[in-house]
From Swiss-Prot:
It is found in: Plastid, Organellar chromatophore. It comes from the Eukaryota. InterPro entries: Ribosomal_uS2, Ribosomal_uS2_bac/mit/plastid, Ribosomal_uS2_CS, Ribosomal_uS2_flav_dom_sf. CDD domains: RPS2. One of its GO terms (cellular component) is cytosolic small ribosomal subunit. Transmembrane segments: none annotated. The gene is rps2. Belongs to the universal ribosomal protein uS2 family. One of its GO terms (molecular function) is structural constituent of ribosome. This is Small ribosomal subunit protein uS2c. GO terms for biological process: translation. NCBIfam families: rpsB_bact. HAMAP family: Ribosomal_uS2_B (MF_00291_B).
Amino acid sequence: MAVVTLAEMMEAGAHFGHQTRRWNPKMSRYIYCARNGVHIIDLVQTAICMNNAYKWTRSAARSGKRFLFVGTKKQASEVIAQEAARCGAAYVNQRWLGGMLTNWTTMRARIDRLKDLERMEGSGSIAMRPKKEAAVLRRELDRLRKYLGGLKNMRRLPDVVILVDQRRETNAVLECRKLDIPLVSMLDTNCDPDLCDVPIPCNDDAVRSVQLVLSRLSDAINEGRHGVQDQRGNDDSEG
């Protein structure tokens, strides 16, 4: 059974690309046509790619790979946190800090600092500090939670990064390429498929489209790790 149906993708608006003047010619093989100055994504190609991405992600999860979900645009932020949490993956959904992967030693120290501050808050240690010092510590805690809260359980670099909006997350893409970390990417018509390993051509701006794709990838991770079939009963064997 298909991982996602054409009807589901149509309903989610996954077929709407960007204005034709903003396209990347490398995406031509995934484009069906142009209407009223907007490219329409070929959902048959999307379905094929989604099936491939599901199998690839499921296989990676089955072999014990660690995943990181990345998407900082407003319409993706909540979905990123929700679906990453559902499959036990780490996530970045507010801002990509430079060196988040390539300077992991420093980033790991900041995550440890976040955990220390949370322990201090939980024990009441911060509340017992002088008012000004407590305020400074709480501001630091709030900032670290905002940007690094989704990484608290990530002890090592991820093996796979799942990305929403390649153009916005350029720094994340470059860091992954530098470290040879495979990228599973939603690709709108202005993206470059050469900069990812597992492409999923679709609308990366619509919340429902993002939700549809990420929920399926989260299902794939859960199935790979726990052998749990999702609600669609996908039981395709590995290609």
